[in-house]
Amino acid sequence: MSSRLRFLFSLAAAIAAASLLAAALRRRAPPSGLAARLVPAPMAAAAARNRSFVLWLHGLGDSGPANEPIRNFFSAPEFRLTKWAFPSAPNSPVSCNHGAVMPSWFDIHELPMSSGSPQDDSGVLKAVENVHAMIDKEVADGIPPENIFVCGFSQGGALTLASVLLYPKTLGGGAVFSGWLPFGSSVTERISPEARKTPILWSHGIADNVVLFEAGQAGPPFLQNAGFSCEFKAYPGLGHSISKEELYSLESWIKNHLKASQEKEN
């Protein structure tokens, strides 16, 4: 099989995995009363002040709206006043797809992604600026940075990592799913002391053949050397997708860090 065909199969698998996940999430009915908590009545929404913010960044070829059902997994009372955002990446030519235009946060030169794959440093930094603008808007609206969580899958996971590391303040946390390091070690010079206090959750399927498991494994040592606390979770048998177990784990992880953040405020 030619390298181009292998790539096309890998890309198709990545997009299919994202589509299947979105479909599965849409089919999953939220627990009783969850819809009312996630979408308050207009008067309640006006009276309630958002206490936290979760920003979810999708993978290559996907869209923000397709990932919105993810929030149905976050049924704990702590998320009653949480604001969610699922932005969509701009349509851009992607090198690994022979220049085809598709939703992409930055350019990707090759798939499968390994720990040694070339990176689009300038494109990543431009995308980071856009993510930081989203975060700054929520901070300006009164949400403490310590109650802001950035999460992402695949390419969105790589952007999550870059955005959290380069944000000048301590955030509630960054959660990476099947992501990778989108830059070299030189970026550590740009990381502020406050950013190093932001906790990282990194989840990766061992059977991932799009963003190889070795690419995920390279993350924690880099983060630890840079002064970050990183919790790494490996999922046997999981390919390039997100499992329900990962999302329930994320809910618990954010809830714990959100509680810690709120205690600091009180």
UniProtKB/Swiss-Prot annotation:
This is Probable carboxylesterase Os04g0669500. InterPro entries: AB_hydrolase_fold, LYPA1-2/EST-like, PLipase/COase/thioEstase. Its EC number is 3.1.1.-. The active site is at residues 154, 208, 240. Keywords: Fatty acid metabolism, Hydrolase, Lipid metabolism. It comes from the Eukaryota. Belongs to the AB hydrolase superfamily. AB hydrolase 2 family. GO terms for cellular component: cytoplasm. PANTHER family: LYSOPHOSPHOLIPASE-LIKE PROTEIN 1, LYSOPHOSPHOLIPASE-RELATED. Possesses carboxylesterase activity in vitro. Signal peptide: none annotated.
